[in-house]
């Protein structure tokens, strides 16, 4: 559901997370004395743009749900249409936040699968979908994005940065807004938060983007420096003219994610993503051999399983190993793997489902 364990490099843990000089959620107001933090946040923005394939990113938002709600409002500001489609396969907490924001901004949200979405009335401001979705399925949304654009609607993609290290980036199939959580880039779970959300857009939407952006300029002596730019939040201009009422960010956690990407490099991130995916493939093969059915053939790190035996029995064995599964309303189980999963974890999972060892 968008939360994963991860390995925090000791260098980042000691020098960033536990260093009081970095501990603030705010983006710096005094660029003259904050060039280091601003440069790190610019690295975060650059990382998000590189991975999502979009033109511009902000310096983080509060969480993925908030980012999705901000995407809804951006779509409404862009074309003034009051209907917004949401794919029901988005994470449930994201859907809940979007519906709450829509209720109080006068936007009608409709939960529809892509095949059910009708853009012919040209009254839809945008569409939000999850890639990969909350059940783990990886789907090609190119056709949906094209249909949305033909009617003047915007396409918003809630996604996973680690998955995008090996999947096709949203920018390549026409998405206008990409958003999600950067938590699994070296930020501990923290019992559910706080985590930094990312938000990236096409160049034509930059001036409508919520949150803060770090830009490059020159000082009085002509030296290249960093500063906050395009500050159209309500702290800086009249409330009714503001692009967003979000007045803070998650700067510390965004800096951790940026440093995680720098620490590993592009090849290192791809290696982590492939390792996670390979572990998921091993688990999926073991489950199928034991008679369990997978709901989706294309996935990255998450499986939805129709058990070939008693679900209660499986959950009982999982409790013995202190492993928590997601129980769907239809009785299927969800499992997500992450970079901390090792061979013993896979063996435990296979034992829980009555399968043979991964060895």
Which residues does each predicted region cover?
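N-terminal entrance/gating region of PLP-dependent enzymes' catalytic architecture
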Residues: 1-43, 49, 237-238, 359
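Flexible inter-domain linker/hinge segments
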Residues: 10-11, 142, 146, 343-359
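Gly-rich Lys/Arg/Thr-decorated short loops/hinges at beta-loop-alpha junctions or inter-strand turns
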Residues: 19-31, 47-53, 79-81, 109, ...
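Short loop-beta-helix segment that forms the pyridoxal 5′-phosphate
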Residues: 29-33, 50-69
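Conserved PLP-enzyme active-site core in the AAT-like
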Residues: 66-69, 73-223, 287, 304-305
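Active-site C-terminal subdomain of aminotransferase-like
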Residues: 185-290, 295-297
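Conserved PLP-binding catalytic core of the aspartate aminotransferase-like
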Residues: 290-319, 337-340
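Noncatalytic alpha-helical scaffolds and linker/capping helices
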Residues: 317-321, 326-355
């Amino acid at each position: 559901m968008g939360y994963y364990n991860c390995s925090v490099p000791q260098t980042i843990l000691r020098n960033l997370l536990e260093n009081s000089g970095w501990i603030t959620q705010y983006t710096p107001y005094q660029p003259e004395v904050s060039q280091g933090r601003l440069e790190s946040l610019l690295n975060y923005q650059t990382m998000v743009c590189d991975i999502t394939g979009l033109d511009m990113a902000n310096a983080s938002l509060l969480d993925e749900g908030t980012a999705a709600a901000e995407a809804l409002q951006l779509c409404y500001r862009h074309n003034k249409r009051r209907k917004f489609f949401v794919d029901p396969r988005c994470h449930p907490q994201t859907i809940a936040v979007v519906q709450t924001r829509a209720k109080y901004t006068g936007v009608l949200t409709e939960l529809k699968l892509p095949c059910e979405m009708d853009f012919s009335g040209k009254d839809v401001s945008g569409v939000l979908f999850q890639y990969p979705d909350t059940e783990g399925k990886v789907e090609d949304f190119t056709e949906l994005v094209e249909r949305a654009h033909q009617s003047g609607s915007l396409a918003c993609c809630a996604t996973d940065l680690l998955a995008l290290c090996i999947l096709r980036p949203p920018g390549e199939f026409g998405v206008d807004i990409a958003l999600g959580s950067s938590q699994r880039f070296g930020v501990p779970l923290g019992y559910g938060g706080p985590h930094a959300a990312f938000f990236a857009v096409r160049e034509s939407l930059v001036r409508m983007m919520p949150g803060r952006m770090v830009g490059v300029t020159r000082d009085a002596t002509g030296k290249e420096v960093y500063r906050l730019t395009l500050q159209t939040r309500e702290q800086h201009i009249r409330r009714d003219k503001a692009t967003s009422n979000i007045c803070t960010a998650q700067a510390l956690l965004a800096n951790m994610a940026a440093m995680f990407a720098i620490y590993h490099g592009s090849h290192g991130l791809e290696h982590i993503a492939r390792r996670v995916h390979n572990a998921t493939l091993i688990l999926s093969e073991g489950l199928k051999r034991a008679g369990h059915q997978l709901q989706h053939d294309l996935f990255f790190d998450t499986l939805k399983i129709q058990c070939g035996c008693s679900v209660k029995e499986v959950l009982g064995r999982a409790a013995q190993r202190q492993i928590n599964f997601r129980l769907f309303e239809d009785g299927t189980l969800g499992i997500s793997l992450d970079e901390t999963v090792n061979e013993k974890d896979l063996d435990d999972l296979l034992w829980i489902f009555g399968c043979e060892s991964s060895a």
